[in-house]
């Protein structure tokens, strides 16, 4: 189910009968202020607390907290990630960090999932997930979805985890080209 996360009443209606909430919000990079992640998280947390739903899994990003010492990341990622997170993606990543704070400050059973750069694959692969540094620069949306569903039925114990696709990933240059030539 879905709702406009800026609308607290719509979020409350969706959450009311849920066993768990999976939040996979996303907005394009912009230089304008962004509040979709943080406001959405605040509305989701409030709705969950008022309806008694306790399990929350939210999608964040490895870019929210770049790890310059990430030895498993390709050189191109270590080169471009700081540029993206401090320029064209700054307002998005600032709001993602606020979202993580809202989630962490809640009394819910939460897990924050930080995928690497997202790309499309029509199938699930053997991905790496958990409290480890991602071994790759990318995460397929299929792998992310598979992991989110698995996490929905587990207790989170306030975990922040990563997920990374290890097979059939694009190169950094293929990803840059894809993003640069996306149709608007």
Positions of the model-derived regions?
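NAD(P)H-binding glycine-rich loop region in Rossmannoid oxidoreductase-like domains
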Residues: 1-43, 47-50
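Oxidoreductase cofactor-interface core, primarily capturing Rossmann-like NAD(P)-dependent enzymes
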Residues: 7-8, 31-32, 49-55, 62-184
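Alpha/beta-hydrolase-fold catalytic nucleophile elbow
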Residues: 24, 59-60
């Amino acid at each position: 189910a879905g709702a406009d996360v800026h609308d607290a009443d719509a979020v409350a209606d969706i959450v009311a009968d849920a066993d768990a909430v999976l939040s996979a919000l996303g907005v394009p990079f912009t230089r304008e202020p962004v509040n979709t992640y943080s406001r959405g998280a605040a509305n989701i947390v409030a709705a969950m607390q008022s309806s008694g739903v306790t399990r929350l899994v939210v999608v964040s990003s490895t870019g929210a907290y770049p790890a310059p010492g990430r030895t498993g990341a390709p050189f191109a990622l270590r080169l471009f990630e700081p540029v993206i997170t401090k320029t064209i993606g700054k307002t998005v990543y600032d709001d993602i960090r606020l979202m993580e704070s809202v989630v962490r400050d809640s009394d819910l059973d939460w897990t924050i999932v930080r995928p690497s750069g997202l790309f499309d694959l029509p199938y699930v692969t053997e991905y790496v997930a958990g409290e480890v540094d991602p071994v790759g620069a990318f995460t397929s949306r299929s792998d992310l979805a598979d992991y989110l569903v698995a996490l929905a039925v587990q207790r989170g114990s306030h975990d922040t985890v990563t997920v990374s696709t290890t097979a059939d990933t694009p190169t950094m240059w293929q990803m840059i080209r894809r993003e640069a030539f996306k149709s608007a």
